[in-house]
Regions:
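Short, glycine-/Ser/Thr-/acidic-enriched flexible segments
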Residues: 1, 24-26, 56-57, 113, ...
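Proline-rich low-complexity regions
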Residues: 1, 13, 30-31, 106, ...
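Short glycine-/acidic-enriched loop or helix-start segments at secondary-structure transitions
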Residues: 3-6, 30, 61, 127-128
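C-terminal catalytic lobe of FAD-dependent flavoproteins
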Residues: 36, 79, 83-155
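Active-site lid/adjacent beta-loop-alpha segment flanking the redox-cofactor pocket in flavoenzymes
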Residues: 10, 27-103, 110-111
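Central helical "cap/lid" subdomain
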Residues: 1-27
């Protein structure tokens, strides 16, 4: 990890990639997480479809901190779109870097005095990151955090 060297042994960067299509006549009823969350998609109100995934199929190529969309990922995602009967052109493609922990559990640590680190949410940072961030604030302000205790981060 670039921001906190102590996290490098616990959290590794992983690239997640997505594409968006032009509005589609296909109907996708609800957001979907398929293949244990490796693939995911949803349709926006305007009919466009957002789809991401393939990290496990692309394997080692995705264990990187390079935030670029690749042709391999776009091809994989286009094949998923075809399986969903979505044939509209791709209008946008992007990639983002997230942290994955070796244990599958978020990394929470105080590696040195006055420094705390949280990360390695394995793709759930939008929810778990907020929860753990608030829990650290609770620890700083109140001297304790029941949430951190419940997750086993405090004795």
């Amino acid at each position: 990890m670039r921001l906190l060297p102590e996290a490098a042994l616990e959290v590794r960067p992983v690239r997640l990639q997505m594409v968006a299509t032009a509005p589609s006549v296909a109907h996708i009823e609800r957001p979907v997480y398929a293949r244990w969350g490796y693939d995911y998609w949803q349709q926006r109100p305007d009919g466009s479809v957002l789809i991401g995934g393939g990290r496990d199929v692309l394997r080692d190529d995705e264990e990187t901190d390079q935030q670029v969309s690749t042709a391999q990922a776009r091809n994989y995602l286009m094949s998923l779109l075809n399986d969903l009967a979505v044939y509209e052109p791709i209008t946008h493609a992007w990639a983002g870097i997230v942290g994955y922990s070796a244990s599958g559990q978020p990394w929470v640590s105080q590696p040195r005095e006055g420094v705390y680190g949280i990360g390695g949410y394995c793709g759930t940072g939008n929810v778990v990151g907020t929860l753990l961030g608030r829990s650290l604030v609770e620890l700083f302000v109140d001297g304790d955090s029941q949430t951190l205790r419940d997750f086993g981060y405090l004795n």
